[in-house]
Amino acid sequence: IGGSPFEVTVHTSPGPTCGTFSHLWLSLIGSEGETPPIRVTDGNSHLLPGSVCPVRVQASSPLGRLILVRLRLEVQTRFPNLDWHCSRVEVWRVSKGQGSDSETQVFLCDRWLRPADGDVELRSGKLCLLEEEIEEKLKQQRLRQLQHQQQLIRWRIFVGGAPQCVDVNSLSELGPNLLYTQKSPATNLYYLNGFTTRVESWKSFSELEMIFTYSAQQNDIARFVKAHWMEDWYFGYQCLNGSNPLMLRETRHLPPNLSVTSDMLRPFLPEGCSLENELQKGNIYLLDYEVLDGVPANVINEKQTYLSAPLCLLHLNQQGQLLPIAIQLQQKPGPQNPVFLPSDSGYDWLLAKMWVHSADFQCHQLISHYLRTHMMAELCCVATLRQLPDAHPLHQLLLPHVKTSLKINVGARASLLASKGLFDQAVGSGLETLPVLLSRASAKISYRTLCVPEDLSDRGLDKLPQSFYAQDALRIWDAVHSFVTSWVDLYYHGDDAVQRDPELHCWLTDINTHGFSNGFPQRFHTRAEVAKFVTALIYSCSALHAAVNFSQLDFAFWVPNCPVAMLRPPPQAKCAVTEDDIMSFLPDVNTTCRVLMALNGLSQPAINFVPLCHYKEAIFRDDAHRRLLEEVQAQLRAISDAIAERNSQLELPYPYLSPERIENSVAI
């Protein structure tokens, strides 16, 4: 006796490039059997953008419960081989009764397919854990998918001692589903273009001011920075709220290699207070760029550049301002490594602060930005694609936050971080330093570093009223953590379910094996542990990236505030430094302009910008998912309103962690 007939409709997504000339073959797979492939694109049925192609499938024997739809594209002779974006396949079993079998089953696809992909199997039904799969065929389908992904997506060592990356040599190897992000056109810095070939030093501050006036006239934050960059209170503000708010930390003990005494610093502390008392009160903060110690500096325009590894002490005064009170430019103390103080001559002290900013730029670019956000996103993406099947709830939650990172990072390694790229030809640390910095920094990153509440508490930033990054980061963390906790609880009905999930633990093992190891969980025991770990990943790929990326140009536009390279060595003695001396330390004109134009491009959101906790993927239209999204989006709107109200009262607003400005992923 033959099986029931099925009415099938194949839905092509509506985008203008979603169609294909290829033929489509379709099979239905049930718990008891499957149909042979039938060609969908016959006669008048074509896979046009937004089209619906109907086909009737007659099963020769009973299929049982319908569980999978198998699709395969075949290139049509003499026609271009175009990728096809399938929205979904809907199947209706034709039967006399009107029971559950008569309902339409929806098999979501929502991705690009290619003839080279071979057979692609679509599932019907909700996301679930492996132990909840009833059908053996669905368990096998999960396994097949992971085996295929592990052959396709492999690990590669980029730098020894740092998180590994995806093993591809070109963007085309990633396939269309990992290439969808598009760069926005950068703001046109027209007046910088003509300077990118001028291989000479800046002549004066007035020359810098001329370029700045023409190029940054619409940038209110950059103009504020230029007006206040020499002031000590602003130096402290930038440590808290600039493009690199990850370096500063409270210290209760002076580093043994910092040559300061209580008497030396007494003039810069409140009357009657000693350095020891201020340390114990938690009023002393430290910037320590030890990671730069001893690394080779770049050669740019055939000129040797120089790096320092400064230590900088800052004091939290009674007005809530964080003021620098001592700067030592190298790690090893000695007579040729003086401690600069606010009481030194104006240009001596200014130059010392510029050296700190230059060191901070190197650490910002490679560590706070590339390592902490880009490499973290890629690590999570590769592990997710390799170890969590599509049907796993954490695969669907995480992928929108990480999948763009592969295209961005592969492109960066082929351009910005490649030989003769921007880092090689314009940045003081250069390519030779890159592996040293990444491996050193990776060894220092702990799990607590990635968890915002612990990180801010450990660094003493959660108590500072002027730390707007810290305030906003905690708000964002709490909202995302609440959302992720609800998502985890939706699918893990108890802690025992977490412990029994082999796919989850293979994923965690992959991250630990190819990523960080300092204090990271080796196994999950509770739902709370899973939610915290996933929140840390999502925060790193979204909010942290927004804070360290989209702020770059604002704080670097005024070149002396953020020297990307230094052309003279750090001073070995205190002396009368002049304005001309200051200018001679700055990078050449072409170097400066090339970096500013690159930062300008990096500061633009993607064309297809998706705000934090907004999702275009069809799976998020499920009723249960939609309710969770409504809750978190309402929380984020309230945070946006609170930040807008606060910023309206500030002379220099902090906008970077306002949720509507946070991209859901590393997409630039």
In which residue ranges do the predicted regions lie?
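Noncatalytic interaction/regulatory regions of large eukaryotic proteins
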Residues: I1-I668
